[in-house]
Amino acid sequence: MERGKKKRISNKLQQTFHHSKEPTFLINQAGFLSSDSYSSLLPETESVNPGEKIKTDTQKKRPGTVILSKPSGRRIISESQLSPPVIPARRPGFRVCYICGREFGSQSIAIHEPQCLQKWHIENSKLPKHLRRPEPSKPQSLSGSGSYSLQASNEAAFQSAQAQLLPCESCGRTFLPDNLLVHQRSCKPKGEGARAPQSNSSDHLTGLKKARSGTPARPRTVICYICGREFGTLSLPIHEPKCLEKWKIENDRLPVELHQPLPRKPQPLPTAQSSQAGPSQAQLVSCPNCSLTFTSDRLLVHQRSCKTQPQGPKDQNLTLGSKGSLKESTNSKQQKNRAAPSVTDRVIHATQEALGEPGGTLCL
């Protein structure tokens, strides 16, 4: 019964709400409502017993609602502007090694320097004596504070490392002593115009003089007194006996009139090369046709292609030739003499006609 009454009241209120046009109607009607009517406006689940509430929950499950409070964009912008900027930590000051000139941290430089000095001693002992350098001394810390003292100490350490460099003789570039030897293998001198390396210390000058004297020069050569070719001082004693044997074999193959006496080894003189060049020139034989000088074995090869003949043998052939050949030569001369006046006769005859003189035969 009670449920029916409540439903009727709620239906009447809904109908009057839809048909009423005044907003104050609900307020007036709310005053006449009893406590039971207030409970009827609430959901049914709230007015039901606990046992009945469980049954209704199993039948209808309504999802729960969550309210999210979204902050305004202006607030986020203002908060980001008010936050201070993040400043990165200051980079530690690097220190320059006074031996190799590289940079290290303030804590690792103390570990590096003893190892670098030990390596320097090992590499310095492997170098030639004229390229060895004195042990580099650590520059004293300068008085100052902050970044100025660090910069000054790094500059002094860098100058100490640069003092270990040696200039190249060819190009003038500076290298460490161990790197200089590697560079000199591929560095080619540019000529006399290459700039000379400048060095302030006397150690550089003495080292450069020793380095120049220590560069490998061309080995001295000696001329063979038989063939006239150049050989080294060590290979010449091996060459001379073989060259003399070869000379004897070639000399025996020549005609008898071209045989040469056995060459003699010259005595050593201060001018060794000039004294040895003389006997080798004495072994040369002149060609009878062109008067060029050759060695005895090369003369035969030259005579095969030499076609020029001297004038002396031709005159002898004319004088010692047969009578027929002499007659032929005289006849040819007479024919030439006859042919010559015929040309002159024509010239004289033409001149006489031009002058108006009577033509006639020219008597010779």
Curated annotation (Swiss-Prot):
A zinc finger (C2HC/C3H-type) spans 93-122, 164-193, 220-249, 283-312. Residues 138-148 have a biased composition (Low complexity). Zn(2+) 3 binds at residues 224, 227, 239, 243. GO terms for molecular function: zinc ion binding. The keyword Zinc-finger applies. Gene3D superfamilies: Classic Zinc Finger. Its cofactor is Zn(2+). Keywords: Metal-binding, Repeat, Zinc, Zinc-finger. Zn(2+) 4 binds at residues 287, 290, 302, 306. This is Zinc finger protein 474. It comes from Macaca fascicularis (Crab-eating macaque).
